[in-house]
């Protein structure tokens, strides 16, 4: 289930939250998780977890197909999340959606990146470098990167510019979906 599936339960089948006067939906932190997938150990205070991006919107936008999503191995359990399969299945789909979106020229995306530059630029750079380092902890990176030496950072911003844009794209999607979900829940009288 996605967050949208959960919020739809406000309406169906028995409007649990509304019928039982529930006014608060308590959730775990939504940040992007690393090894161990604990929501309390996120890579960023401000970023959202790409695992929570609803792929339906990407299908509706024509960036993915239903078949691609259905043919992905998400694991066999409806009650247990297989995070390894989630990672292995979700990121190739998200990368494909990114390539198909041609988002770099989208005015709304550009505005989002500019408005959130105070955290998004460093977060996207960090994640791009982390991927380029095989997912290794930053403690294992070469000293110039680990110590954020200006020349090393400039070089990475140039060499990893497309990967940086990918991570910005994920945050753009997450933020859009989260804002819509929150507005929907708030409209039903539910605070998050």
Segments from the language model and where they lie:
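Acidic/aromatic-lined carbohydrate-recognition and catalytic surfaces
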Residues: 1-192
